[in-house]
Amino acid sequence: MASEQPVEAAPLGGSLSDRISKPDEPTASETPEQTSDQADGASAPLGGSDLREPEYNVEVKLSDLQADPNNPLYSVKNFEDLGLDPRILKGLSAMNFRKPSKIQERALPLLLGNPPKNLVGQSQSGTGKTAAFVLNALSRVDLSTEQMQKTPQALILAPTRELARQIVGVVSVMGQFLDGLIIGTAVPADINNRPKRLECSIAVGTPGTVMDMIKRRIMVPNKLKVLVLDEADNMLDQQGLGDQCIRVKALLPRDIQVVLFSATFPDHVHAYAAKFAPNANELTLQHEELTVEGIKQLYLDCSDEEDKYKTLVQLYGLLTVGSSIIFVQTRTSASEIEKRMVAEGHTVASLTGGIDVTKRDEIIDKFRSGEAKVLITTNVLARGIDVSTVSMVINYDIPELHRPGVPERQADFQTYLHRIGRTGRFGRVGVSISFVSNREEWDMLNQIQRYFNTEIQRVDTKDWDEVEDIIKKTIKNTRANAQFGKQ
């Protein structure tokens, strides 16, 4: 059976459009690492675990132009056709995978082929890419001896500890029937709690910690066969992570199979991928339409910043119907809102990048289990974290791009999509509510509506019975569809 080595703890007033209000001082995030006003997480590329693309094709560009597209393993419709270990197939069944997703149809034959080839793939969360690279890693590790079971053979790099822990969960479930599989984590933690040697078959971690553990000989990399870099675009958006990944790779065997996934491929990501995974097969998604199913998008007018807080408190009873996430721009906002709500007798928790790593794990585990119902967070949670019980997302601060020297405030469309994608998961109904308190925020909301060719419904806060009625009806509906038009 697979085992995980616990290496490191792992409102009020009329429509804003009918009045002119003086813009508040913008709460733009600060970039220095330790400032309390820091906005956690980079601007997230497009995607989210339940953001489905019902109409997209996967385009394949082979590094070997002589490869035969008619080969039966060029694309597969069933996992059984891949010649997988029956124990891995059993793990896939335990995860309720019945047939490959579109990205898996094309990625898996390329990943599993021998001799191993590098792969660069464009894939958003929710398309099955995590399962694809985990399946490849599980298929390539040698568990025949106790020594090999304790020797790192596959390394998966993620931009955040939360995402790393989530990937560990996928490895644990998919590999649960593989005797001798040991999963190790290499994420930020108290250096005194590190083991003398990382003994595992598959290691999952963040770039800086992995690099440090290799240099200290805690992780011995000379038997590694597979290197996965997940969410490359997010890595490059966060200062230093892309360079750290390059330095990690330089410490690994030259013949290692390199797998890189990214939600978007602007020029700088494409150039990075070509350097990080040379001569790779490439998969790209050809989007026809992007649909968010099961999410009702609303907005509330607030007269000022204080009114935003009062509106949030007024909503508290609805926030606890299921689980809710409140997104704010800075760590300071998260801390202040938590303190005020707790002082007033409300049960909430906050999670930001400035919180001790062990405490962060405790908070998110409580939120996953339902022990904590309301979570206040920055963009640290806007990307890739799956919590199935979330029924409501509050954009307390509309997500915006940090553009030094540019006076106009610009909405961050990709982070907005990621945030609201935390709700309405796995076929459930969800609600997203954005707070608007000044003309600049109103302009950013309109930017979002125009960009996605969608209408975000205004709810009049003069009548809280109506507000509650609308939200409760939405949550109780079997489905609440909201579609974004063609891009």
From Swiss-Prot:
Membrane topology: Peripheral membrane protein
Job description of the protein: ATP-dependent RNA helicase associated with the nuclear pore complex and essential for mRNA export from the nucleus. May participate in a terminal step of mRNA export through the removal of proteins that accompany mRNA through the nucleopore complex. May also be involved in early transcription.
Family the entry assigns: Belongs to the DEAD box helicase family. DDX19/DBP5 subfamily.
Lineage: Eukaryota, Fungi, Dikarya, Ascomycota, Pezizomycotina
Record bears the keyword Lipid metabolism: no
Motif (DEAD box): 230-233
Gene Ontology CC terms, in alphabetical order: cellular bud tip; cytoplasmic stress granule; nuclear membrane; nuclear pore cytoplasmic filaments
Disulfide bond entries: none
Catalyses which reaction(s): ATP + H2O = ADP + phosphate + H(+)
Name this protein carries in UniProt: ATP-dependent RNA helicase dbp5
Main location: cytoplasm
EC number annotated for this UniProt entry: 3.6.4.13
